[in-house]
Structure formats: structure tokens, C-alpha cells
Amino acid sequence: MLDPPMRNGSMSFGSQMQAFLRRFTDLPAALRALATALFMGLPLWATAQVSPLDGPVRFGILPLGGAFESRSDWDPLLTELSRAINRPVSVLSVNSYEALEQAIQRDEVDMAFLSGKMALDAVTQRRMKVVAQVVRHDGLPGYRALLLARKAPPLNSLKNLLEQPEHWRLARGERQSVSGFIVPQLQFFLPNHIAMETRFSSEIVGTHQTTALAVANSEADVATNNTADFERFRLRFPAEAERLQVLWQSELIPHAQIVVRREYPADLRKRVQAFLTGYGRAKGARGDAERVVLKSLHDLAGFVAADNSSLQPAARLAYQLARQNAMTAQWVNDAAREARLQRIESGYAEQVGVLKDVSP
């Protein structure tokens, strides 16, 4: 039964719909088809926004050499990973630690190869979980930070560096770099009352390859580096490496980790972990090919299963550096320094709590 007209002369909703349908059926067939497609497509478009967790797994890579170089080294492994987890894997390779850190903060990275402070921040602040840690052929549980200088005089001795740092030009890593900044600052420069950011005549900030080349080519006088990257540098730049010497080396630093977004299903994280820990372990041609890929990735021997607790040494390093900086900084009064130290203690306690989560 039709709805009666409203008393004010307007039509009821049912009458309006019938009028609309009569006009719609009078349209040419082509226009009716177009209108139907648009009408039906609107709700689909509104609900078909793809979640990042349903799209490609976005893998972030530390810029250890250069962006292109890092990507080409990882491509074969990531192609196999894509097959193993039955999902596409895209690569984010950047030119700086800062660029990778910003991408992680914008949730543009789902999985990453990170070390030290960056891995720690990803786990404690950006909802990531550790699934694996790299191992190298030397069998050591870590690597060492280095200070490199030219063999040729005059600026070629640790004694001279300690006595006159303002005469030296520094080439260092970014502040997020464990061996390029954090460990040299904590274990060498600050104990000798030298602030890396202010005591040198000039500085170059870049990758480990960039810093080593800067000293070899006389663009800087001392560079931060590490044992793993310097070995790689010797192979790629033998003539330049021959000009360099090691002035200092640190205590052992734990190897880098693979972290995965916490929102991914546990089953996917386990499959990623299983793939990584099995990569390069097989016998025969396939295993040989995988071991060649691993060797190109900073002479890696493979991966071992790991969890968030593997970042406890990194948390301890960051805590020690923050305390050192607070103790040596200038403050308006003792209360301000004490407040800063209390915030450092509180932040460290929170990190330790997060790192106790060792669930898969």
C-alpha cells in the first residue's frame, strides 16, 4: 500500500523512493549500469582500505654501506623469505640511521635488521619483537668498536689524540649508531673528558664505509668504526685500508637483531624465525648458495633464535651513556641533575620490564 501524501504537501519516504525508481528505469541502459556501479562501489571502497598487516612485509635495512649496496646484498635472502612465508616482502633501504628511525616511527616498517639502540627503541617504543640475532664466522658473540687513524704522521697516535683532540678532525657515525657513536663515547671519549660533538676541529657524520674512507683520503684524522665493517672495508678498499691503523678497540658489543612487528600473528613470526635460523644450514648446492649470500652480508654465518632479552646489553649501554652525560653536563643546580638522573633510572626500569617479555 502506498504511503499517503504528507499534510504539508511533501512526499513520504516511500513515495520518494518509488518516484526515484521510476526515473531510474527511464535512464538509458548505459547510464543505469554506470550509476549502479558507482552506487555499489561506494561501500566497497569505504571498507576496502587494506591494512598494512595484510599487504607486503616491509623490511628495513641499516645503511651499513650505502642504500643501494645494502639492498642488493639483502635481496636474495628476502626473495627466499617471501616464498617461505607466502607473502610479498618489500625493501626499505635508506641512507641514514635517522631516515630508518623516522620510517619506523611512521609505522612504515614491519620487519628490520637493527642493532643496539635502534633495535632497543623499536622493541620498547614501536611495538616490535626480536625473533633472531646474527652470528659471524669468528664465533664471537659480538663485535668491537674501533678508532681508526692513518699510519702516517703527524696525527697517528692515541697519546696525541688524548692530549690535543681539538687538532684532530673526526669522522663518526650517527648518534643512533652503537659502534659509530655510543660505545666510543661511553668507553673512550667521556672517560677521558672528551665530548665527541664539541672537542674536535671538524666532523663528518656517515656510514662506517664513509668514515673509514674519510680518514684514508685525509679528509678526517680519526674515525669510529667496528671490527665487522672494517674487515669488509679491507676487502673492498684494500689500498685505502692499508693506510689505516687501529688506535683503540672497545669491549664486545652484541650482534644485530631481526625484529618483527608485534601485531603480526605469532605463527607468522615463528615462520620468519624458522626461515632465518635454517638459512645457510643446508648441505649441497642450495646451502652453498645461501652461505654466499650470508658472506656478502658482513661475513655472517647465519642467524640464531633470539627474543627481547637479547637487547638487555644494549639497554645497559644506553643507560650508562645517559648517566655519564647527565653527570658531566652543566646544570642550574643539583636538584635539576638529580631529577634527570631519576628519569634515567625510571626509563631504564621500564625498558628492562619490556625486555623480560620473551614470548614468541
Ranges and model annotations:
Residues 98-112, 125, 143, 208-223:
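Short helices/loops that flank or line small-molecule/ion binding pockets
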Residues 56-63, 136-146, 238-273, 291-307:
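Periplasmic-binding protein-like
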Residues 1-29:
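N-terminal secretory signal peptides that target proteins for export/translocation
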Residues 116-126, 189-190, 216-217, 221-242:
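A ligand-binding cleft/hinge motif common to bilobed small-molecule-binding domains
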Residues 32-43:
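Bacterial N-terminal signal peptides
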Residues 54, 58-82, 94, 140-213:
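Bilobed "Venus flytrap"/periplasmic-binding protein-like clamshell domains
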Residues 65-66, 72, 76, 271-360:
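An extracytoplasmic/periplasmic, membrane-proximal ligand-sensing/linker region
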Residues 46-50:
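Boundary at the C-terminal end of the N-terminal hydrophobic targeting segment
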